[in-house]
Amino acid sequence: MQVLPPSSTGGPSRLFIMRPVATTLLMVAILLAGIIGYRALPVSALPEVDYPTIQVVTLYPGASPDVMTSAVTAPLERQFGQMSGLKQMSSQSSGGASVITLQFQLTLPLDVAEQEVQAAINAATNLLPSDLPNPPVYSKVNPADPPIMTLAVTSTAMPMTQVEDMVETRVAQKISQISGVGLVTLSGGQRPAVRVKLNAQAIAALGLTSETVRTAITGANVNSAKGSLDGPSRAVTLSANDQMQSAEEYRQLIIAYQNGAPIRLGDVATVEQGAENSWLGAWANKEQAIVMNVQRQPGANIISTADSIRQMLPQLTESLPKSVKVTVLSDRTTNIRASVDDTQFELMMAIALVVMIIYLFLRNIPATIIPGVAVPLSLIGTFAVMVFLDFSINNLTLMALTIATGFVVDDAIVVIENISRYIEKGEKPLAAALKGAGEIGFTIISLIFSLIAVLIPLLFMGDIVGRLFREFAITLAVAILISAVVSLTLTPMMCARMLSQESLRKQNRFSRASEKMFDRIIAAYGRGLAKVLNHPWLTLSVALSTLLLSVLLWVFIPKGFFPVQDNGIIQGTLQAPQSSSFANMAQRQRQVADVILQDPAVQSLTSFVGVDGTNPSLNSARLQINLKPLDERDDRVQKVIARLQTAVDKVPGVDLFLQPTQDLTIDTQVSRTQYQFTLQATSLDALSTWVPQLMEKLQQLPQLSDVSSDWQDKGLVAYVNVDRDSASRLGISMADVDNALYSAFGQRLISTIYTQANQYRVVLEHNTEITPGLAALDTIRLTSSDGGVVPLSSIAKVEQRFAPLSINHLDQFPVTTISFNVPDNYSLGDAVQAIMDTEKTLNLPVDITTQFQGSTLAFQSALGSTVWLIVAAVVAMYIVLGILYESFIHPITILSTLPTAGVGALLALMIAGSELDVIAIIGIILLIGIVKKNAIMMIDFALAAEREQGMSPRDAIYQACLLRFRPILMTTLAALLGALPLMLSTGVGAELRRPLGIGMVGGLIVSQVLTLFTTPVIYLLFDRLALWTKSRFARHEEEA
């Protein structure tokens, strides 16, 4: 047993060095907990940071946008506006549909928001139209969030009405019940119904009106309680044939008598089994289909939700006829898994590179094994803590662990290098471990807490960006803390038992060659450092110039919000002239689909035409383009989009707007392009005046592309101008006029057919194929007070006008959204500034307010807080270092290394053509924590040499630089190689990871070169300043 000197206490490491079994078992426990935690952690693309969002949809077939706004949307908005915790309320009122999107504060639980929404709907019920077919329906879903899965249901033998009926009752309901599913929408609109198409000439010839027919149908088809008979011995329930189930039964319905002869419905109308809404259609590739879009609840885990759906699909499809085919056209989790797999591979690559650099420096297998154990142990142990914090394995947490690879090895390297130095001097391994660990303990604590201090401001970032990076910061901090524990426990224990003078002195040809190389490098560094110390003011000017250069680079570098990801899915909006009909739009859509499907990168396509909860008007269509996997196509998504738009430009009469689907969705409205800018006013007239002027100017800006607006005020309207006096003399009310028009042209739902499985509608309309266009209005007949039949044309004139196709509100006021993309040679920051400058030139009136929305608003918020975030990180680190060193001066010396890192990071981003986005800013903040390690290691040893060996400050810092050169170089290269796989990543999701790697690699290279010279110079200058200050105070005290 070795006899230890009294001074060899080993500090906090002593207990673990002396008890190797306990230390080993403790580390095994950390390893097992981490492995169990890894298996229990869910997988997702990004941390779950969705705003609690609820969508409320109300359908009122036949109602104009103006009626939907005043009769449906406005009463609901007034009730919703009184809810607490509401962040933003937007609405879209179009022909027959009202969609209100409610976005709540991040702190409000979604279930609480749901209760408030239900209460508000109940309060507004009495204010809504009495003939509303169905009450408002809410869904816990963000309409702008792309579906997690899209399925197409087709059949070669069955009509689409039967297919939709089966899908709705057998498939969609079951999927809706899966935990995490927020909404299942069926696009294609082929719900079964009995359609009654009146022959206007026939009923007019018989002296009947559409109101007569409607009354007859509603009275003939009822489903109500009839009671029961309760006798002395038995009870009998009453039933009757009050329901009509088929088109044939309705065809035989007697609606009136004339001269004693019955007039049946089939005599004056075409009665057929059809679709409830004939102005809806969906296609999968070129085949008509029922398209099922599955959206998740905000906050639900996308991977587990998609897995549950796939597990249930075989069981659901077995219940369908063999002629019905269910195809999964898109699954966002495929790319998410691929992205996470690529990030995990880069994590393993980073570990391998770090271990390789350790061996290169230590040139000793036992010495390499020690940090080779410490690194994975620290990372794996982090998973156990992540489980307790409800984190997930996602791109950001894996990026944090990848970056942590370079951090966690630093502590082990510093400990090993210091212990090895004492062994090489002749100390016994155990004594060297105790002495070296005790000596380096304070340095390790300084490194750890100063690094964690940098991450603290990230935890206080506001809004969704702060939530997004909270998991990143905490995961990284936990890994760093675990590495500190491992470095002060396991690492010195392993050094005491695995290192020896023989093992350290044992050299092969590679060891000898590398040793000579390092000796030459250290000698050259020593000569260069001596020259630099002789010219301190020149070196100081270089340090100050880096500070100035970092500010200039910060001002001029292109700025963005979040990297545009290639997730293999493109969302598209097809726009046609505002007067386009459903048939015309469907034809144009099929032309565009043919062009898109010819592109070699496209795997499948779904498209939808018609007005529903997501599509506002008949002149627009929604498309989802699913690309082939990244390794099966030559181009990334942005190039594919450019190619598709060029190809579709050849199709006359349509405009196509495309944007890649992103994992992070901040918007609440389905947009044509990536970024949005809104104009809000107190009236639609103000918008109609200023929107065209602003659009004209924005379309001329080179910083913007694909500029479009949702302002569509040229929809054709047939305005029925009723002579109220004439109508009153005949006993005809405006309600009679509206009823007649609605029954003729509104696809009016007049009755319900009840079955055991579902409910179906009876739809009444005029057969416009007999009398098409505006001439159909001449066939409308009304009943006067004396029972006579009066043509509508005798009391009204029809005028053709223009009106908006949809009316949009933001927080209850009219709004229009201008959408835009940013060309490749400009940044989002350039675009935002150009829009703001253009707005100023217009001199908008005070009743017009403008605001960026969605990602652009988040970009402005993040950009505004970035400088303060960096300042907060620097201040936090200064406070921690000041407390640790009990000095106001030494923390400034350490922080003087930061500008060099900023210069390197910003230069690297500019050279690589990357924007300064949120991911890159996080990299710069991390650099603040990394590069100061060099200064800490130098200053710690210089202070110790001054204090213990009585050396002069110059000799102390010179010796410290030479002694710590190798660990400084080793730790910097380890951090650099930890970030290198992120910088060089090319797989799925590489766009998200690359800016972090580029910034860190560039910052580490420049800071490594400069701080090795600037830090000792600044240390000496501040030492002289401290001496001068002390002498001044001493002189004043003597004089006093």
UniProtKB/Swiss-Prot annotation:
Topology versus the membrane: Multi-pass membrane protein
GO molecular function, one term: xenobiotic transmembrane transporter activity
Pfam families tied to this protein: ACR_tran (PF00873)
Transmembrane segment boundaries: 16-36, 347-367, 369-389, 396-416, 440-460, 472-492, 537-557, 863-883, 888-908, 911-931, 968-988, 998-1018
Subcellular location(s) per record: Cell inner membrane
Primary location class: membrane
Record InterPro entries: AcrB_DN_DC_subdom, Acrflvin-R, Multidrug-R_MdtB
Keywords associated with the record: Cell inner membrane, Cell membrane, Membrane, Transmembrane, Transmembrane helix, Transport
Endpoints of the signal sequence: none
The keyword Ligase belongs to this UniProt entry's keyword annotation: no
GO CC field: plasma membrane
Recorded family membership: Belongs to the resistance-nodulation-cell division (RND) (TC 2.A.6) family. MdtB subfamily.
Subunit structure: Part of a tripartite efflux system composed of MdtA, MdtB and MdtC. MdtB forms a heteromultimer with MdtC.
Protein's UniProt name: Multidrug resistance protein MdtB
Organism taxonomic ancestry: Bacteria, Pseudomonadati, Pseudomonadota, Gammaproteobacteria, Enterobacterales
Recorded name of the encoding gene: mdtB
